[in-house]
Structures are given as structure tokens and as C-alpha cells.
Swiss-Prot record:
Pathway(s): Protein modification; eIF5A hypusination
Reported function: Catalyzes the NAD-dependent oxidative cleavage of spermidine and the subsequent transfer of the butylamine moiety of spermidine to the epsilon-amino group of a specific lysine residue of the eIF-5A precursor protein to form the intermediate deoxyhypusine residue. Also able to produce homospermidine from putrescine.
Reaction(s) the record says it catalyses: [eIF5A protein]-L-lysine + spermidine = [eIF5A protein]-deoxyhypusine + propane-1,3-diamine
Name of the protein: Deoxyhypusine synthase
Residues binding spermidine, per UniProt: E135, E136, D242, H289, G315, S316, D317, E324, A325, V326, S327, W328, G329, K330
Gene: DHS
CC cofactor: NAD(+)
Signal sequence range: none
Keywords, alphabetical: Hypusine biosynthesis, NAD, Transferase
Family as reported in the entry's similarity comment: Belongs to the deoxyhypusine synthase family.
Keyword hit for Nucleotide-binding: no
GO terms of biological process kind: embryo sac development
EC identifiers of the protein: 2.5.1.46
Length: 368
């Protein structure tokens, strides 16, 4: 009898009755390669694969929601809206405003070409990056970056005049070419400041550099052509800052006003209404915080996709999940959000393939 009682107790503990998840959650299923190699189906299977594959699948869904949204989708029309906002054709034309942020290492990598594609076809509306994210784009127009190895010894590379970015190598000569190219532009900017009272800001400087580089491989060139603002609040932190420093010894007086840019950046979010706003942020640090902070000015973004490998246990903004930004009012409580814990050089091209690129291909096909 005692054994029966113990068995019954243990059995009921181990085999506790489950709540049914049928119809509430997706079943975990991977891609079946018996059906052949179908890349769109493979990518769709990410949603039900689990772990970060599912997060990537969710990110694809969120970005597609950003791209599909129209003001006409909103069933309620605000009583105090303008007559234009009540017009059905106008409402159908209003799209989500997309902020894209990325760190410099991604421009050092081949992700630069993915970013250039998005800017070239005006698929994003506002860009925020670091100084390295600016100069690496320009320098690649002057000289290439090469693939090396993570394990190459620093002292050896230094003796050869080679700079390592992860497993990428940038010859020091590239920065010499950058100096030769950019210093005359600074001279001309200073002349325009003195003679024409031009007030330079970081974003105006970057537009000018995009114009001057005149190279279709550059995302800055396309941002200039498409009139997409590029913000870089940490302008002096990088080789571009070094060049400004060196230029100040040659001739002083060049002024770059960051206050005008914070007004412009925050204004991109504040004046977005009646549009929704979406954030796609690769990596952390300054671009992530700057975009989120601007969206706080409008009571939060409506969509957010973060792709980075940062962790939140150290309290860094870089590693924070979207929900932390909700607590600050940088993302709305009702927003569609996801963080993908993955190297963006892997995740972002796949995401673009299943979102921006697919939709552009579909649009082009419908026109032919």
C-alpha cells in the first residue's frame, strides 16, 4: 500500500497535466530539404525553428509590417485631423517612416553594400551612424578593405602598417588617401562659411561628402542624391575627427553646429505624424540610443527591430531589450518589437532579402 501511495504521488508530480497549447502557439518545425532547396520557404521556416532563428523570422515579419502599413489601415480618423488626412487617397499614400541605425564595423564589412542598396532605392528615411560608419564608406571609394584573420598578432600588423577590424584589414595608406581627399573639401567649406555665412552641421557635412565622393558604391552618395538625412552626433570620434583636428592646425575657424542637428534629428520623429515610425538598429551604442531618444519625443516608435549580440546584465543601452526602451517612452507599449541576438553580418542581409528586396522585386514585376 505504501509503495502504491508513493508511486501515485511521484507519478502525479512528474506527469503534471498540461494546459493545451493547440491553436495558441506555433508548432516547432524545421525546413524539410526533401522538398528541394527553396530559399523563401527556408526563410519562412525560421519562425518555427526556435531560438534566434525564430527571432529572425519575427524580425522579418515586423519589418514587413513596417513596409506594408498605410495610414488608410487605421480604422479611426482623429476628429482634429486636417481635411487632407481625411482624404482616402492621401491616407493610402502615407507610409511608415523608417529610421536605420548601424555601427561602423558594419560599414567596414560587406553589409555596407546592403545599406547602400536600401539608400539607393530610398527604402529608409533617416540614417544614424558613428563616425566610422561615415569614413569607412568614403575610404572604400578610395581604396579597398581586405579579409584577414581574427588571430593575426597586433604587433606584427602594426609593423606592417595594417589596421585590424575583427578579421578585416585596412592598410594605413587608406587613411593617407582619405586625408588627401578630404582636407581640400574642409578648405572649401571654411571658405563658404566665411564668404557665404554657411552654417555647417554634421548632417550638412555628410551630405557634402556624399556629393563630393560621387561614387555609386557609396551609401553617402545615394543619401545625398535621395535627400536622405544622415546624422552622426559623435562626429569627432574617428578618422574624420582626426582630419578635422589636422585641418585645425592648417587653418582654424571651421565651425560645425551640433545643436542644429539635434533639432533636425528630433524633428524627424516629432513631425512624423500622421505617419507611424519604425526603427531598424544594427549594433548598439550611439546610433541605437540616438534613434530611440528621438522617437521618445513623439511618445515612442511603433515598430522596432534590434540586431546585436549585446547583453543586458551590465545595464548597457547597447544590450538592452526593446522592453527597456518602452519604460522610457522610446517605444510605444503597443509596438511590434523584436531583438535578434546575432551577428548583423549574418542576419541583416537575410532580413533584407525577405523584406525590402522581395517587395521591390514584386513592385518591379507588377510594372512590367
Amino acid at each position: 500500500m505504501e509503495d502504491d501511495r508513493v508511486f501515485s504521488s511521484v507519478h502525479s508530480t512528474v506527469f503534471k497535466e498540461s494546459e493545451s497549447l493547440e491553436g495558441k502557439c506555433d508548432k516547432i518545425e524545421g525546413y524539410d530539404f526533401n522538398q528541394g532547396v527553396d530559399y523563401p520557404k527556408l526563410m519562412r521556416s525560421m519562425l518555427t525553428t526556435g531560438f534566434q532563428a525564430s527571432n529572425l523570422g519575427e524580425a522579418i515579419d515586423v519589418v514587413n509590417q513596417m513596409l506594408d502599413w498605410r495610414l488608410a489601415d487605421e480604422t479611426t480618423v482623429a476628429e482634429d485631423c486636417s481635411e487632407e488626412e481625411k482624404n482616402p487617397s492621401f491616407r493610402e499614400s502615407v507610409k511608415c517612416k523608417i529610421f536605420l541605425g548601424f555601427t561602423s564595423n558594419l560599414v567596414s564589412s560587406g553589409v555596407r553594400d546592403t545599406i547602400r542598396y536600401l539608400v539607393q532605392h530610398h527604402m529608409v528615411d533617416v540614417i544614424v551612424t558613428t563616425t566610422g560608419g561615415v569614413e569607412e564608406d568614403l575610404i572604400k571609394c578610395l581604396a579597398p578593405t581586405f579579409k584577414g584573420d581574427f588571430s593575426l598578432p597586433g604587433a606584427y600588423l602594426r609593423s606592417k602598417g595594417l589596421n585590424r577590424i575583427g578579421n578585416l584589414l585596412v592598410p594605413n595608406d587608406n587613411y593617407c588617401k582619405f586625408e588627401d581627399w578630404i582636407i581640400p573639401i574642409f578648405d572649401e567649406m571654411l571658405k563658404e562659411q566665411k564668404e557665404e555665412n554657411v552654417l555647417w552641421t554634421p548632417s550638412k557635412l555628410l551630405a557634402r561628402l556624399g556629393k563630393e565622393i560621387n561614387n555609386e558604391s557609396s551609401y553617402l552618395y545615394w543619401a545625398y542624391k535621395m535627400n536622405i538625412p544622415v546624422f552622426c552626433p559623435g562626429l569627432t570620434d574617428g578618422s574624420l575627427g582626426d582630419m578635422l583636428y589636422f585641418h585645425s592646425f592648417r587653418t582654424s575657424g571651421l565651425i560645425i553646429d551640433v545643436v542644429q542637428d539635434i533639432r533636425a534629428m528630433n524633428g524627424e520623429a516629432v513631425h512624423a505624424n500622421p505617419k507611424k515610425t519604425g526603427m531598424i538598429i544594427l549594433g548598439g551604442g550611439l546610433p541605437k540610443h540616438h534613434i530611440c531618444n528621438a522617437n521618445m519625443m513623439r511618445n515612442g516608435a511603433d515598430y522596432a527591430v534590434f540586431i546585436n549580440t549585446g547583453q543586458e546584465f551590465d545595464g548597457s543601452d547597447s544590450g538592452a531589450r526593446p522592453d527597456e526602451a518602452v519604460s522610457w517612452g522610446k517605444i510605444r507599449g503597443s509596438a511590434k518589437t523584436v531583438k535578434v541576438y546575432c551577428d548583423a553580418t549574418i542576419a541583416f542581409p537575410l532580413l533584407v532579402a525577405e523584406t525590402f528586396a522581395t517587395k521591390r522585386d514584386q513592385t518591379c514585376e507588377s510594372k512590367t
